[in-house]
């Protein structure tokens, strides 16, 4: 077989493989979107009645929801007439379903909610082992909230680094109060992604494009604020909390906090 023919066959094989990978990702997105929900609150006397605060995703038995703790806190204002819950549906045709906050992990900025009513399609969680740098990933959420209707948006991402949530600074004056508090706790690794996300993406699942298995939770407020406290202009870097911490919070009893 001549060298040009071999190169042609190799090129065709690469093209076919790339097409198959793209097709797999499209199928994964369609499946994952069924499990991605908005997080917010409902108050009948307010206009609009439903206020969006972030993204979450369904796990376990189809009634458990994982999101960021700060997303839930934003929805809990102590008003007895206000109810925390999830928002499902597409476009303008969305539905609000009440939820109960089961447990909150302030250290890793995660929360576990349980919804009322029928179960929804659930995502599978990874085994908790840290991923290898260089892995291609995807994440789906609501970067713009409900401003233009409830439309989930998917982004590709590259796991560019695994770093401590807070790095000791050469100058203590560059560390904010939150960073100093975190240094006093046990530091844990977070995923640094080569992708752009927005505050509405907080709580979005980070998953394998081929399998849909979730390996992390996007965090655009808590982690980003700690990691970039010494930077005058925040970067476009996206961070995610490893899924092992979501696995831990799912095992806690109702009302437990950390």
Would you name each region that the model predicts?
Residues 7-17:
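Bacterial N-terminal signal peptides
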Residues 23-25, 42-68, 96-98, 203, ...:
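A conserved glycine-rich beta-strand in the N-terminal activation segment of trypsin-fold
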Residues 27-28, 75, 100-102, 116-151:
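Active-site substrate-binding loop(s) of clan PA
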Residues 31-49, 114-124, 153-251:
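Active-site region of chymotrypsin-like
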Residues 59-60, 78, 131, 209:
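Short, well-ordered loop/turn sites that connect or cap secondary structure elements
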Residues 60-106:
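Catalytic-histidine neighborhood of serine endopeptidases
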Residues 61, 104-108, 162-168:
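Short, conserved beta-turn/loop elements at beta-strand boundaries and strand-helix junctions
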Residues 82-85, 90-99, 133-138, 152-176:
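Beta-strand/loop subdomains of soluble extracytoplasmic proteins
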């Amino acid at each position: 077989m001549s060298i040009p023919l071999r190169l042609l066959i190799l090129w065709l094989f690469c093209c076919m493989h790339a097409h198959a990978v793209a097709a797999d990702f499209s199928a994964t997105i369609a499946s994952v979107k069924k499990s991605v929900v908005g997080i917010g609150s409902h108050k009948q006397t307010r206009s609009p009645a439903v206020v969006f605060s972030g993204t979450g995703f369904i796990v376990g038995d189809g009634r458990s929801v994982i999101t960021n703790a700060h997303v839930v806190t934003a929805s809990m204002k102590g008003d007895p007439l206000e109810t925390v819950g999830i928002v499902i549906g597409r476009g303008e045709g969305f539905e609000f379903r009440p939820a109960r906050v089961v447990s909150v992990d302030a250290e890793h900025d995660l929360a576990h909610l349980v919804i009322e009513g029928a179960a929804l399609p659930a995502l599978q969680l990874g085994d908790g082992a840290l991923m290898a740098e260089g892995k291609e990933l995807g994440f789906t959420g609501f970067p713009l909230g409900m401003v233009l209707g409830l439309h989930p948006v998917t982004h590709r991402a590259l796991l560019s680094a695994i770093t401590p949530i807070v790095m000791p600074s050469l100058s203590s004056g560059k560390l904010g109060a939150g960073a100093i508090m975190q240094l006093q706790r046990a530091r844990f690794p977070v995923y640094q992604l080569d992708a752009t996300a927005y505050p509405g993406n907080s709580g979005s699942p980070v998953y394998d494009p081929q399998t849909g298995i979730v390996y992390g939770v996007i965090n655009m407020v808590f982690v980003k604020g700690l990691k970039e406290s010494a930077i005058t202009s925040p970067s476009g870097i996206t961070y995610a909390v490893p899924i092992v911490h979501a696995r831990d919070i799912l095992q806690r009893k109702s009302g437990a906090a950390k």
